[in-house]
A protein has these predicted regions:
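Catalytic zinc-binding patch centered on the HExxH motif and its immediate surroundings
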Residues: 310-332
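Post-HExxH zinc-binding segment in Zn-dependent metallohydrolases
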Residues: 256-257, 362, 367-405, 469
């Protein structure tokens, strides 16, 4: 029997609604707007890192669970919940700050230790929330808590059954975190040598770590009552409203529809140049994009600029990638990019800025990863129309869009099949053989590069999000091209969504499902016109 699980997708937003009702969000943005204009918002350089106090976390959790059982005064119970959330947010803030500082210098032993300590708390935090919500589900004040002004109708239904977060499962989560940190410690050195040298020295070790993760994750899925790890991850981590089987069918359609186009373009070599690009060029590109888009995008950029909530400088000791993270206690997002110093950096910064805008607009509320990636990739596409005019960059982005379908599709296919490999094949040789087969089927070459994909280690079954969200983002671009202002309006309004499920979000936004019959043929026709 499948154990009941529920991943909290909008914790910060729920916290805001729980304490103050919907009106608080509007008041928050009004206050934030005045802070921006007055230049009074917290700067990143003034943010203080405090190592999480686990004893306080546990004590407040115990007190909150006891209050859920015994308290008859709604306001007193809400105050107790608030006290717990305060500690919870402090830990989330420490996690975000430690990740940012460690990413800025991955040779810094202090920040490495702090990041590893904080990241290892994920399982404990989620288990704590699960325990709290199960206690509230039994509270005599549950009817009031499930009112519209607080958690909402039937919120606690998901917490009435058996909890997954027992000692055994939490131990698995801790083991997973240890393996992830083992990977990141080695991955931190990738920028210190040529990629070929790095792979020669470390590929087999990293492959072994991935194999251990696959074995462990299959055990986790079985323990939770699922037939496969992809099914488990789709629900537990990503809250998807489509299945791994739908993904498999979609990837087969990409192979049939877009891989031949990809191969044709690779042979003809379109006239696209990857120009060099300075940090100033990258910053100016996104600044002009925000000015052109206006509204929420411009407000978010002001916040990012005035509070120093970004790092786009190059560095050999920095994390070799990019991300955006929300800093809960300060109620602001942060963007990190380690640039390649090519024109592609403009798109990368625009991508992470799209995530920044969503977190700014939604008060840090979390949606499903597929929905979140629509905002980032949508901002990339819209930058082509609202940023500085650049025909070469437009072609580069469209080629990149095709590559997302094909190359990220190949990675998604490899990852999904990886969790079906026989245990005797879960080694460097067996995984390489699978990777080569998958790459060949997508018209690509493949060696050991899969060990350089952090998502396989830290965010399992995430990669398909890039593919399906790319399709939605491309639709927003097409909408804007057809009628000026419509795509921009769609993207800005979507930033405020509380709809976490991808297909439901698409319907809400008036967009097609990427799985819709004929959709890939439309994409192929559009890309052919631009790239051939």
């Amino acid at each position: 029997m499948k154990k009941r699980i529920c991943r909290v997708l909008a914790l910060c937003l729920v916290l805001c609604l729980l304490l103050s009702g919907c009106q608080a969000i509007g008041e928050y943005f009004s206050v934030m707007g005045s802070l921006l204009m007055g230049g009074s918002a917290y700067r990143f350089s003034d943010m203080n890192y405090v190592r999480p106090d686990l004893e306080r976390f546990q004590a407040d959790l115990d007190a909150c669970c006891l209050a859920a059982e015994t308290e008859r005064d709604l306001q007193k119970l809400l105050d107790q919940i608030y006290a717990f959330y305060t500690v919870f947010d402090e830990i989330c803030t420490a996690q975000a700050l430690s990740m940012i500082h460690y990413s800025k210098n991955m040779t810094d032993a202090y920040w490495e230790a702090e990041y590893q300590f904080c990241s290892a708390l994920d399982g404990e935090l989620t288990a704590g929330l699960d325990r709290l919500y199960r206690a509230l589900a039994k509270s005599p004040l549950r009817p009031q808590l499930e009112g519209e002004a607080y958690f909402g109708a039937d919120f606690f239904v998901a917490y009435e059954g058996e909890s997954l977060y027992d000692e055994a499962f939490c131990a698995m989560l801790a083991q997973e975190s240890q393996l992830q940190n083992q990977y990141l410690a080695l991955y931190a050195t990738v920028g210190q040598m040529e990629q070929a040298t790095f792979l020669e020295n470390h590929a087999e070790t990293l492959a072994e770590v991935l194999a251990q993760l696959v074995i462990l994750r299959r055990q986790m899925a079985e323990y939770a009552g699922y037939d496969s790890y992809p099914e488990f991850a789709y629900e537990f981590y990503h809250a998807r409203d489509y299945t791994p089987a739908q993904t498999t069918a979609y990837l087969a359609d990409i192979r049939a529809e877009l891989v031949p186009l990809f191969q044709q373009i690779a042979e003809t070599k379109p006239e696209i140049t990857l120009y060099s690009c300075t940090q100033t060029d990258t910053y100016e590109y996104v600044r002009q994009t925000a000015n052109g888009l206006g509204g929420t995008f411009l407000q978010a950029f002001w916040l990012m600029e005035q509070s120093g909530l970004y790092d786009i400088a190059a560095g050999e000791e920095k994390y070799a990638g990019s991300f955006e993270v929300y800093i809960a206690d300060y109620q602001v997002p942060y963007v990190f990019v380690n640039p390649t110093e090519t024109e592609y950096d403009k798109l990368t910064f625009a991508h992470e800025f799209g995530h920044f805008c969503n977190d700014y607009a939604s008060y840090g509320g979390q949606v499903g990863v597929d929905v979140a990636e629509v905002f980032s990739q949508g901002t990339e596409y819209m930058s082509l129309l609202y940023g500085p005019a650049d025909a070469n960059l437009t072609k580069l982005k469209m080629l990149d869009g095709l590559c997302v379908y094909v190359e990220q599709g190949a990675l998604a296919s490899f990852e999904q099949q990886l969790y079906t490999l026989a245990e005797e094949e879960l080694n460097a040789q067996g995984m390489q053989a699978l990777y080569s087969r998958v790459c060949t089927s997508f018209g690509l070459e493949g060696s050991m590069e899969y060990v350089l994909v952090p998502h396989f280690y830290t965010s399992p079954l995430y990669v398909i999000s890039y593919v399906v969200s790319n399709d939605a983002a491309l639709q927003i671009y097409q909408m804007e091209q057809a009628t000026t202002g419509t795509g921009r309006k769609c993207l800005e309004e979507s930033l405020y969504t509380s709809q976490g499920y991808f297909l439901a979000f698409l319907e809400e936004a008036g967009l097609k499902s990427p799985f819709a019959t004929g959709r890939l043929a439309e994409v192929k026709q559009m890309l052919q016109q631009i790239l051939q």
